[in-house]
Amino acid sequence: LAVSASPPPPLYGQSVIDAIDIRYSAETDRTTVVNMTNHSYFNLDGDPSKSNSDYLLTIDADAYTPVDSTFMTTGEIVSVEGTDMDFRTPTAVGARIDNDFEQLKNGKGYDHNWVLNTKGDVTRPCATLESPSTGIVLDVYTNEPGIQIYAGNFLDGTLTGKKGIVYGHRASVCLETQKYPDTPNKPEWPSALLKPGEKYDSHCIYRFSVKK
C-alpha cells in the first residue's frame, strides 16, 4: 500500500491563504481498507479555554449513522428530522448537546457521522462552523459521503498545548470528512475497500473567511 497526502493547487477560486486544501491518494498491491481523514481541532475564537457552545454549526445532511453505547455504528441510517442531530440550519453546538437524548448520551455529546447531501460535489460546502464572537467562518468541502463531527467531549483540561495553553472541555470542534465508520462490516454502505489497479482519492478543503 502506497499512501500520500498533499496540498494540490488551489481550486474553485480559493487562495492559499484562506484555505487548507488536502488530497489523500493511495494505491495497493493487495485488497485493503482505506478511509483517511483529518482530526484537526478547530477553535475559532483563538482561546482554547473557551467552550465551543456558541459556535453555529450547519451540516448539509438529512440523515446520520447512530452509534451504540460502545461508540460503534448500529448499521442504521436515520433521519435527523425532529431530533437533536438536525443541523440543516445554523444551530449552536451547545444548544442541545446535553439533552436527554440517547445518541448524545452514547457519544458523550456530538461524536457522530452525518450522511451528506452534497454527493461528492467539492464545489458545495457540506458543513459550516462559525464563531459569533470573532466572525470567523469555516466552510468544509469534500468528495466523501460522510462527515464526522466531534465536539471535544473528552477534552478535560488536562492537555496542554503550545505556550502552555490548556485545552478546556469542548474547546474546539473536529470536522472529519470520510466514508461512514465501520464500512467493512456494512456492505450496503459506500465501500472503503481498495483493490489492486484502483486509486483512492479523497479531497477535503477547509476554507476560512470573516463575516462582516
What residues fall within each predicted segment?
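An exposed, glycine/acidic-rich loop-and-rim segment of catalytic or binding clefts
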Residues: 1-212
